[in-house]
């Protein structure tokens, strides 16, 4: 009997040791950046599917870019921290981007909102701001933002969702996106209307012609895998276009959010007014 008791105690201790060694060291949930947006409490399964505030102050760059909804750490973060619109942000380098294993359950969304704060100056690059990776499209991205031909108060601005493009060509996006100040960008898609809306600093920007009517109904993002922030696929060593003209983002970025619903105009304005 004593031998059996001794064996059970040893086995229990061994299980505890193995279990503790197999878990990635993470801080308690209280250490993750909190979301100050009162409209959507931050919890797994809620409307806010992915959110990184870039507010970490650790020497571990992965910790500084962790997603606060599901504690989703990037697999790689080559970018430096910088002063953000609220707390800290990231500074793009034009070459590399942050790679996440997924955007949590955002790929199950049938409507969506993509929101971020950006701060940049005039440059000659064709820059990619983010990519939701998918093998279903020739460019291997189910959503991305491309900006080029920048001037202080105008640029060419292209947003793609399931290979349906809203394009402000020939520098027809006439907003001061490159004046060196912080600006809020948001893109909403509503499955009930099939309309994609673009917002700049809390105000809707009319989409060219009928391009905002994507005609998709419910989105199908189920094939989406990695999320790239601050660049396109090639900047995170993921397959996709590798043309030399494709540059990663060079400015500062903060408060990157993915919602599984189309935010209303007032909800987008609230994000802008609250610097979230």
Regions picked out by a protein language model, each given a short descriptive name:
Residues 21-94, 269-276:
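Extracytoplasmic low-complexity segments
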Residues 130-161, 215-218:
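Glycan-recognition/cleft segments
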Residues 209-251:
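Flexible glycan-contacting loops in extracellular carbohydrate-active proteins
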Residues 16-20:
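C-terminal motif of bacterial Sec signal peptides marking the signal peptidase cleavage site
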Residues 49-58, 113-122, 231, 243-275:
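Extracellular, beta-strand-rich glycan-interacting domains
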């Amino acid at each position: 009997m004593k031998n059996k008791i001794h064996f059970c105690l040893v086995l229990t201790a061994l299980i505890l040791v193995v279990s503790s060694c197999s878990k990635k060291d993470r801080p308690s949930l209280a250490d993750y950046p909190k979301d100050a947006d009162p409209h959507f409490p931050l919890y797994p399964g809620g409307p806010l599917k992915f959110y990184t505030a870039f507010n970490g102050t650790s020497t571990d760059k992965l910790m500084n870019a962790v997603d606060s909804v599901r504690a989703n750490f990037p697999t790689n973060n080559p970018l430096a921290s910088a002063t953000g619109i609220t707390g800290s942000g990231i500074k793009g380098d034009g070459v590399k981007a942050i790679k996440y294993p997924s955007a949590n359950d955002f790929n199950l969304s049938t409507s969506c909102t993509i929101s971020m704060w950006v701060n940049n100056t005039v440059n000659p690059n064709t820059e990619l701001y983010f990519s939701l990776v998918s093998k279903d499209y020739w460019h291997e991205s189910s959503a991305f933002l491309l900006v080029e031909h920048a001037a202080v108060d105008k640029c060419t601005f292209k947003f793609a969702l399931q290979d349906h493009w809203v394009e402000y060509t020939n520098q027809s996006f006439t907003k001061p996106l490159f004046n060196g100040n912080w600006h809020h960008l948001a893109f909403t898609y509503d499955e009930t209307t099939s309309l994609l809306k673009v917002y700049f600093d809390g105000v809707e920007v009319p989409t060219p012609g009928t391009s905002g009517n994507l005609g998709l109904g419910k989105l199908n993002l189920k094939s989406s895998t990695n999320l790239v922030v601050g660049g396109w696929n090639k900047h995170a060593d993921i397959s996709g276009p590798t043309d030399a003209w494709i540059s990663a983002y060079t400015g500062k970025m903060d408060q990157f959010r993915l919602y599984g619903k189309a935010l209303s105009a007032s909800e987008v304005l609230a994000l802008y007014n609250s610097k979230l």
